């Protein structure tokens, strides 16, 4: 559904203009209602509301007695904010989430199938350098995978 990285700018109010190629899909899928939340990689995740709801339900159904699970619930659900595309296709990225991800004016919106990641441009470039160097190795489940 959503793929590719698109350099975009945040305006002085922290608004992001959603690239035109995604707007129609977002309007038909969720009437422009999106959820923005924090990601452990220090970027933001942006979900169409109907895609987010089962994720949130699953997270909330997990035991809060497991410290790792509770931390993830706090991070993802505790930071989740409802946002809505305005008439010209912009969303307001909440200040607390902009600070969390270290977002400045220049950002990259990265399609990840059913969701987006939003990265500060410099951090995104570092992520790509790391990925190209295979610093973390290739996951076992990808061994034998052919492109």
Curated annotation (Swiss-Prot):
Keywords: Cytoplasm, DNA-binding, Repeat, Transcription, Transcription regulation
Primary location: cytoplasm
Location of this chain's protein in the cell: Cytoplasm, Nucleoid
Pfam families on file: MraZ
Transmembrane segments: none
Family classification: Belongs to the MraZ family.
Subunit structure: Forms oligomers.
One GO CC annotation: nucleoid
One Gene Ontology MF term: DNA-binding transcription factor activity
Organism: Nitrosospira multiformis (strain ATCC 25196 / NCIMB 11849 / C 71)
InterPro entries according to UniProt: MraZ, MraZ_C, MraZ_dom, MraZ_N, MraZ_sf, SpoVT-AbrB_dom, SpoVT-AbrB_sf
SUPFAM superfamilies: AbrB/MazE/MraZ-like
GO biological process assignments: negative regulation of DNA-templated transcription initiation
The SpoVT-AbrB domain, residue ranges: 5-51, 80-123
Name this polypeptide is given: Transcriptional regulator MraZ
């Amino acid at each position: 559904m959503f793929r590719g990285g698109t350099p975009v700018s945040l305006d002085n109010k922290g608004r992001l203009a959603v690239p035109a190629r995604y707007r129609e899909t977002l309007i038909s899928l969720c009437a422009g209602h999106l959820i923005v939340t924090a990601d452990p990689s220090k970027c933001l995740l942006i979900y169409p509301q109907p895609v987010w709801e089962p994720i949130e339900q699953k997270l909330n159904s997990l035991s809060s007695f497991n410290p790792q699970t509770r931390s993830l619930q706090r991070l993802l659900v505790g930071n989740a904010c409802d946002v809505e595309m305005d008439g010209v296709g912009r969303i307001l990225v909440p200040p607390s989430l902009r600070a969390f991800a270290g977002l400045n004016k220049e950002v990259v919106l990265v399609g990840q199938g059913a969701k987006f990641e939003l990265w500060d441009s410099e951090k995104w470039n570092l992520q790509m350098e790391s990925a190209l160097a295979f610093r973390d190795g290739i996951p076992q489940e990808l061994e034998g995978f052919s492109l």
